[in-house]
């Protein structure tokens, strides 16, 4: 059995109780490199085999999963945040389906919620916004045209924008072009809830 487990947003104690117990029971753990707090690996039992997926190809990850299944070992695939958000789990699940290997998912706390907690803010304020849009700027992974920053900005709902810190000037321009007022409150949060977290309050323009 393979378990896709969300490691949470950063702080080791923000993993779910279920996620912690799965780590304690695992015979094999494949974790997402530096994106996952290494303190979480302390939950693993002494005999657990641990692999860093940052140094592995998808084929190598799947090979470990298949070997574990054949040996009747329980495997945890430890992803950052919540596996369902930018976790690239679908391609792994498709291959597991093809191989006939069963799997389950355990949710985690995503970065946008860790950031909100660090800033003591609420995304859904009566009279301002009752919706939260989770999106990203286009990088190596293409974003459908209908999901452009401008089209989402037109709703003027709260937005959590991932994987985009290297494109802040362009992001600001596109948010304003889409409909946000220049003075709309904004924040930049790096490594939310980690010990070296950095957070900056600003506006959409700045």
Stretches found by the model and what they are:
Residues 14-18, 37-38, 62-64, 120-121, ...:
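A generic local structural motif
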Residues 44, 119, 175-179:
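Active-site catalytic pocket residues across diverse enzymes, especially alpha/beta-hydrolases
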Residues 1-109, 114:
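Class I S-adenosyl-L-methionine
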Residues 2, 60, 71-75, 131, ...:
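A contiguous loop/helix-start segment that scaffolds small-molecule binding in enzyme catalytic cores
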Residues 11, 82-85, 89-155, 195-203:
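Class I SAM-dependent methyltransferase SAM-binding "motif I" and its flanking Rossmann-like core
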Residues 32-33, 54-55, 137-138, 162-166:
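Structural motif
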Residues 20, 42, 67, 123-125, ...:
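Short secondary-structure boundary/capping segments
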């Amino acid at each position: 059995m393979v378990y896709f487990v969300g490691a949470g947003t950063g702080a080791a104690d923000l993993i779910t109780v279920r996620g912690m117990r799965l780590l304690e029971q695992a015979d094999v753990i494949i974790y997402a490199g530096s994106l996952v707090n290494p303190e979480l690996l302390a939950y693993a039992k002494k005999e657990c085999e641990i692999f860093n997926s940052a140094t592995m190809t998808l084929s190598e990850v799947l090979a470990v999963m298949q070997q574990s299944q054949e040996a009747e070992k329980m495997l945890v695939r430890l992803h950052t945040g919540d596996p369902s958000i930018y976790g690239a789990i679908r391609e792994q699940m498709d291959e597991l389906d093809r191989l006939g290997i069963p799997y389950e998912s355990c949710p985690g706390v995503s970065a946008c919620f860790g950031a909100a907690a660090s800033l003591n803010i609420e995304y859904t304020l009566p009279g301002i916004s009752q919706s939260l849009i989770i999106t990203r700027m286009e990088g190596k992974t293409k974003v459908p045209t209908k999901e452009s920053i401008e089209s989402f900005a037109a709703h003027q709902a709260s937005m959590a924008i991932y994987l985009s810190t290297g494109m802040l000037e362009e992001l600001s321009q596109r948010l304003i072009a889409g409909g946000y007022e220049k003075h709309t409150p904004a924040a930049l949060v790096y490594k939310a809830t980690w010990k070296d977290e950095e957070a900056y309050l600003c506006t959409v323009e700045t």
